[in-house]
Amino acid sequence: AFKQGLFELQDAASQRVAPLLLGDWTPAQGSLKVADCCAGAGGKTLHLASLMGGKGKIVAMDIYQQKLDELSRRAKRNGAFNIETRPVEAKYLKRQRGSFDKVLIDAPCSGLGVLRRNPDTKWKLTPEFLDQIRSTQVQILEQYSQLVKDGGQLVYATCSVLPSENQQQVQR
């Protein structure tokens, strides 16, 4: 059933992000333009596509082409044809400024919220790494928040429990 695209595996907490982003929107309300800005292999992208019922367009972006290739493969297997994958390009981002109804940023983080799955993470963290990842998060927020149209919505998510990677980032 998995190989046929009948289901995808995803962490329970990850399942909360797509409904939060879509809010009260339903496919009957018309189409949406959604950006998934740190899409990776696309777990949340595929969930968004499922909830959107094939309506609208999802642009899934990442800096790693191999992850986007995996997302394309998974989307095809799942019959999610409203997903466009794009490597992050400054020219594209500039052209798309203010054009997305909804923007999801599932930012890279320390991973402190998923220690039960990756217990060795706590031994690998250094103050320097945390400073670097927070700096990356600031850059990502500054870059992708410009994609949201007036009246649109941005959801910023991490799998960290640190306020410095969550609330403090969006309050800047």
Say what each PLM segment does.
Residues 1-172:
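S-adenosylmethionine
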